[in-house]
């Protein structure tokens, strides 16, 4: 790094806006949301989504309440083109949802884009071109008048192409790409030229979208830029002013919030901040920030864990455990003073009163999460190395949510025994909890041995046979109960796990599955570990189950039995 970075980098000039009004305003309603997960988010993936994953994510975006969804860049990708046509031809877009497609200012691309959405009930077509000095001068070699002519000519072409499709309501969106780095006078001149070329009016809707293509300033500077434009755009009453913040400086959410104060009516972003480089603005965080201020966001995150699973599976990108609102650790307090404040807050919180629990800006149950692991003990009490010791000494690598669950079990035992738990003690607890599941509320009063507290179990595996079946596979499963009685159950499903669930006759939902090598044994003696996370509709939260066997299919079946046993034990304990 340079000792004097000013020799290499220049600060963005402040906006001359001495009478700025946005700092004294208060947010009172949610913006119009556009999800760009299927376009901006998709193009930033190691492996872009195929049509199946794009359709799955599209339906999830509709489910949580997005009314505008950017479905792709059809002129640049055959998969995008086919996906867009499939959505339209199969009538998969609800009447209250508007798709958006993107194109550069090129005649062939605009023609292909119109073809991709012809026949849609209503569609937004998104034009963009870069206008900042570095792009004008270095990349394109164009003057400002040439940029304006480029915009006007291609909007005129778009009007001619869409005139032959009166069955579709055409909405134009124009983005002066690199807006945040361009001269405001140039941005205004180009945007006003686009507004006039489209002839924006009561029956010709138009969106002016102002992006932080690359985030280069503090959020207040961006807010000043938005307010400056908001005051000066022509035909403002017929425009929707939109922003598209990126997160290069880590302040995309703040940029969006302050831009809304400055006049932005619409925000484009991605679930959990996916997108190019450091990502787009995280619409989940932004929406829930509004929610915690008493503003209905218009998006439903009442099962945020399910949404996170879909996003992770479709994008193949993990969500950080510290990610706001959704991370596995965001509702966990390790500090003793935090734990004390939270405990007192819960004790004082009345069901009908405003939320006032310290350190928790939102009630986790509003997001479908539980209170189970909010208060935990860390290394201050000698328990912080649980996951490390299991991995180092026993080759067990637990998923993050399983670490949270298991540490709570260990802490309960440690608190009762008032003794230090060694690595072997931890393994004993792990083995008896997951490999021989116990009933709920075990008695930890006997501090000389763990066995009295952990000896009861259910669904003991004996053997199984798998057979082909029209549904996939059929399992004949032999089980023993705690009395040693043997029984046989059967079920079918699209694989051994689904068949096992069917055989048990429980409304068990498998939320995640992982398989690992234990790193012990060679060849036929090598041990495999299967881990499932399961949920029951009648029981809050989820439970993990583990199976260990040299055959991974058998280990998977045993993992399902483990999870089911833990639920069965808890329900028996309640009875």
Curated annotation (Swiss-Prot):
- SMART domains from the UniProt entry: LeuA_dimer
Principal localisation = cytoplasm
Known catalytic reactions: 3-methyl-2-oxobutanoate + acetyl-CoA + H2O = (2S)-2-isopropylmalate + CoA + H(+)
PROSITE patterns registered for this protein in UniProt: AIPM_HOMOCIT_SYNTH_1, AIPM_HOMOCIT_SYNTH_2, PYR_CT
Known pathway: Amino-acid biosynthesis; L-leucine biosynthesis; L-leucine from 3-methyl-2-oxobutanoate: step 1/4
- Binding site residues for Mg(2+): 40, 244, 246, 280
Name the segments for region: Regulatory domain.
437-575
Per its UniProt record, the required cofactor names are: Mg(2+)
Q: Name one GO molecular function term.
A: acetyl-CoA C-acetyltransferase activity
Q: Which key words tag this protein in UniProt?
A: Amino-acid biosynthesis, Branched-chain amino acid biosynthesis, Cytoplasm, Leucine biosynthesis, Magnesium, Metal-binding, Transferase
Q: Does the keyword Secreted apply?
A: no
Localisation per UniProt entry? Cytoplasm
Cellular component (GO) terms are: cytoplasm
* Location of the Pyruvate carboxyltransferase domain: 31-305
| Entries under Pfam families matching the protein | HMGL-like (PF00682), IPMS_D2 (PF22615), LeuA_dimer (PF08502)
Q: Which SUPFAM superfamilies match?
A: 2-isopropylmalate synthase LeuA, allosteric (dimerisation) domain (SSF110921), Aldolase (SSF51569), post-HMGL domain-like (SSF89000)
Enzyme Commission number(s) of this protein: 2.3.3.13
Q: What does this protein do?
A: Catalyzes the condensation of the acetyl group of acetyl-CoA with 3-methyl-2-oxobutanoate (2-ketoisovalerate) to form 3-carboxy-3-hydroxy-4-methylpentanoate (2-isopropylmalate).
Which NCBIfam families is this protein grouped with?
Answer: PRK03739.1
Q: What is this protein called?
A: 2-isopropylmalate synthase
Encoded by which gene? leuA
């Amino acid at each position: 790094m340079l000792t004097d970075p000013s020799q290499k980098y220049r600060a963005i000039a402040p906006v001359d806006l001495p009478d700025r009004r946005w700092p004294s305003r208060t947010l009172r309603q949610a913006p119009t949301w556009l999800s760009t997960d299927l376009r901006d988010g998709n193009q930033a993936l190691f492996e872009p989504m195929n049509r199946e994953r794009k359709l799955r994510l599209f339906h999830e975006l509709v489910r949580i309440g997005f009314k505008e969804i950017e479905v792709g860049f059809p002129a640049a990708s055959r998969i995008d083109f086919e996906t867009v046509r499939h959505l339209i031809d199969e009538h998969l877009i609800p009447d209250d949802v508007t798709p958006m497609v993107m194109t550069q200012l090129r005649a062939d691309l605009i023609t292909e884009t119109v073809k991709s959405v012809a026949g849609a009930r209503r569609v937004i077509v998104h034009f963009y071109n870069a206008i900042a000095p570095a792009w004008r001068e270095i990349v394109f070699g164009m003057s400002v008048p040439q940029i304006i002519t480029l915009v006007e000519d291609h909007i005129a072409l778009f009007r001619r192409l869409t005139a032959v499709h009166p069955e579709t309501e055409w909405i134009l969106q124009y983005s002066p790409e690199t807006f945040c780095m361009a001269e405001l006078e140039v941005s205004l001149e180009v945007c006003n030229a686009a507004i006039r070329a489209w002839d924006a009016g009561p029956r010709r809707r138009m969106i002016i979208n102002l992006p932080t293509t690359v985030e280069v300033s503090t959020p207040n500077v961006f807010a000043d830029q938005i307010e400056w434009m908001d005051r000066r755009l022509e035909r403002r009453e017929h425009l929707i002013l939109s922003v598209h913040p990126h997160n290069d400086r880590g302040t995309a959410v703040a940029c969006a919030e302050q831009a809304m104060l400055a006049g932005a009516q619409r925000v484009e972003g991605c679930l959990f901040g996916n997108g190019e480089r450091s990502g787009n603005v995280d619409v989940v965080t932004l929406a829930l920030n509004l929610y915690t201020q008493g503003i209905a966001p218009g998006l439903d995150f009442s099962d945020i864990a399910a949404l996170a699973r879909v996003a992770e599976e479709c994008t193949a990108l993990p969500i950080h455990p510290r990610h706001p609102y959704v991370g596995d650790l965001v509702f966990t307090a390790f500090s003793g003073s935090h734990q004390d404040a939270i405990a007192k807050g819960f004790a004082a919180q009345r069901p009908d009163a405003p939320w006032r629990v310290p350190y928790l800006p939102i009630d986790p149950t509003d997001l479908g999460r539980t209170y189970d692991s909010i208060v935990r003990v860390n290394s201050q009490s000698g328990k912080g190395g649980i996951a490390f010791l299991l991995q180092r000494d026993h080759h067990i690598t637990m998923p993050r949510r399983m670490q949270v669950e298991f540490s709570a079990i260990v802490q309960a035992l440690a608190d009762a025994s008032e003794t230090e738990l060694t690595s072997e003690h931890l393994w004993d607890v792990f083995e008896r909890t997951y490999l021989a599941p116990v009933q709920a509320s075990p008695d930890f009063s006997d501090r000389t041995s763990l066995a009295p507290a952990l000896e009861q179990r259910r669904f003991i595996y004996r053997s199984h046979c798998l057979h082909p079946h029209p549904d996939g596979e059929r399992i004949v499963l032999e089980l023993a109960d705690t009395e040693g009685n043997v029984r046989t159950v059967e079920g079918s499903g699209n694989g051994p796990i689904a068949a096992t669930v069917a055989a048990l006759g429980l409304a068990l939902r498998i939320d995640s599955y992982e398989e690992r090598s234990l790193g012990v044994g060679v060849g036929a003696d090598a041990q495999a570990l299967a881990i499932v996370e399961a949920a029951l509709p009648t029981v809050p939260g989820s439970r993990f189950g583990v199976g260990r066997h040299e055959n991974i299919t058998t280990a998977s079946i045993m993992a399902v039995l483990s999870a089911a046993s833990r639920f069965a034990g808890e329900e028996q304990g309640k009875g």
